[in-house]
Amino acid sequence: MDAVLYSVPLSFTPLRASSSPSSPYLLLPRFLSVQPCHKFTFSRSFPSKSRIPSASSAAGSTLMTNSSSPRSGVYTVGEFMTKKEDLHVVKPTTTVDEALELLVENRITGFPVIDEDWKLVGLVSDYDLLALDSISGSGRTENSMFPEVDSTWKTFNAVQKLLSKTNGKLVGDLMTPAPLVVEEKTNLEDAAKILLETKYRRLPVVDSDGKLVGIITRGNVVRAALQIKRSGDRNA
């Protein structure tokens, strides 16, 4: 297994800070406090010739990113994120039924929640909207992608009952406030480590004012890894 070395500490920042010792916005999870020069395994099949290219090798690459500037040898979140123009977002005042319809129509599993000025105020997922933790026993686990066969029908009936109780409920009542965020300049390796090794499926990308500018997902990371590998193969 080959590995990529990164020397930039994580750039994650909470959306808000609080002076309260019990505030969930004051301290980040311990795994985010990474020291420089830790090793991050990007992919099991990531060959040595496909390491993140230096500035010289990347100059002739046809790697497709969001940036048209010359390669610096370090990939950032901003180059591979989904930009806000392509995102589906909701507001705290969006009804749960409206949000669920958008989820189904667009085949997605969650939304960033923004205010009138595009400031990020939370995240909401399909599980939040349906309160599925209340019918799943021990709650959602990322490792169990498919439900037990004998529980499927019971779960379906429970979802139907939950849908009958969503009238009048708003996204703001169910969203996760002040989620973990990254910036466009955050090292892609740092974001990938969080997305691939934890429960997080998506990380909102915000500017210095806390306004949403994009989102980086597990799918974005996998796509980036494939593009980097192909670029390395061409330059080998």
From Swiss-Prot:
Give the primary localization class. plastid
GO BP annotations listed:
cell redox homeostasis
- What InterPro entries does the record tag this protein with? CBS_dom, CBS_dom_sf, CBS_domain-containing
What keywords are assigned to this protein? Acetylation, CBS domain, Chloroplast, Plastid, Repeat, Transit peptide
Q: Name one GO cellular component term.
A: chloroplast
The cross-references to Pfam families, in alphabetical order and at most eight, read: CBS
Q: Which residues carry this modification: N-acetylserine?
A: 54
Task: Show the SUPFAM superfamilies listed in the entry.
Answer: CBS-domain pair (SSF54631)
Q: Point out the transit peptide region.
A: 1-53
| Span list, region Disordered | 47-66
CBS domain residues are 81-142, 175-231
Subcellular localization, per the record? Plastid, Chloroplast
**Annotated CDD domains:** CBS_pair_plant_CBSX
* Record-linked PANTHER family: CBS DOMAIN-CONTAINING PROTEIN CBSX1, CHLOROPLASTIC, CBS DOMAIN-CONTAINING PROTEIN CBSX2, CHLOROPLASTIC
Which protein, by its recorded name, is this? CBS domain-containing protein CBSX1, chloroplastic
